[in-house]
Amino acid sequence: MLRRVAELPWPLRYLLIAIIAIIVLCILCWVDKADESRVELHVRASHPLGIRLAPSLARWYRVDVPASQVDDALAAMRRDPFVDEAFVAPVVSLPSVDDGDACPITTPAYDHLQGYLAPAPDGIDAAAAWRRGDRGGGVWFADVEGGWNARHEDLPGDRISLVHGSPVDAPGWREHGTAVLGEVVGIANGRGVTGIAPDVERVVTASIGSSTSAAAIAEAARQLRAGDVLLVELQGLGPLGRFMPVEYWDDNFDAIAAATARGVVVIEAAGNGGENLDRALYRGKLDRKKRDSGAIVVGAGAPPRTGFSDRARLDFSNYGTRVDVQGWGRRVATLDYGDLQRCDDDTRERHYTDEFSGTSSASPIVAGAAILLESLAQRTLSPVQVRAVLAAAGSPQTGNTREHIGPRPDLAEALSAIERSAMRSR
């Protein structure tokens, strides 16, 4: 029979192949149900005598079959002498890089990525405080910036309250604020990240949305008590068009100074302008000998084992005598953004990152250290005392120390210094 088919003119042969394909399709589909899912098969016709044919799309057929009959359809077609190849059509997609890992059913622990918690000199040695049985209990914490996602699975939403302004309706602000809170108060539950001070009693947020930064700082401070900690996660463009710490502007300076005068410990980002804050251009506004807001100003230092010199100033960080201490300015694991874990929904409640950076990532580390110091001290420490202890008891800056950003806090040494001071005062 095959020989007879081969003797047919070529147009008739291809017509016969097409008819056979149609018959096979009809046989496969006669029991089809309207609501059954479909699968597309790709079938290539062959020469019945095995003669090699030139590649041509004219030899390809598309067969749509019910999903339940895929295996039988493939087997039947592959046995057919007129079929050279048959396979399930692949599902094609854009050749883009996935923005994050697949979302697991349960978020795993990411604390092994939080090197900033590690013993000094790599981190601030948060465990030195935790071993004393305290993780920030009794202290209130405020964060001043633009927005947050208090519904994130790793935040204590029942302890977070907005006291001023309207959150800025922009993903960048929400991601930033959520990442900041994760570093400080991320829940210690064996999943996701663990905040430096997860047992903080109350978390206050104050937004610059529909407000000024000075008003937001003032209202956040008004909600706090002596010994509580306020973090200012803001920067502004200075006279050279570079980012500056917000106390450069007099209204912000006054709001911060009023807060520290009441005993509130204020942590302030140095800013990402790569600028020398001791320049004469700034007219001594960032010279503590001329005026001192009482805030702890935080620069961005390089983390260990990342291709940079550990504890050296990162090039974007502002520097100068006004900068007191440093925190990790790169590779910080915390909440949101989604480059570490991304879940496909609009809530972003299970997003995590290990790439948070800038003086934005450095400042919450110091804020967490300050909370633990206040929580464990036998008496309320003044803002100036907290600043002095953190600056004196730390792992020293490396690299070009003339571009001063100060040491990385060492809580083990800082707590020992406080205990020694308490014993001397008895």
Positions of predicted regions on the chain:
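Autoinhibitory N-terminal propeptides
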Residues: 1-53, 78, 82-99, 125
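Substrate-binding/access-modulating region of protease and related hydrolase catalytic domains
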Residues: 5, 131, 135-137, 205-293, ...
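Surface-exposed aromatic
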Residues: 47-67, 201
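Protease zymogen maturation seam
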Residues: 50, 54-58, 78-140, 153-154
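Active-site-proximal loop motif in hydrolases
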Residues: 117-121, 131-151, 160-192, 205-215, ...
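Catalytic-core environment of secreted peptidases
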Residues: 144, 153-155, 160, 306-360
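Hydrolase catalytic cores
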Residues: 205-207, 329-406
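C-terminal subdomain of the subtilisin-like protease fold in secreted/lumenal serine endopeptidases
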Residues: 223-233, 295-297, 375-426
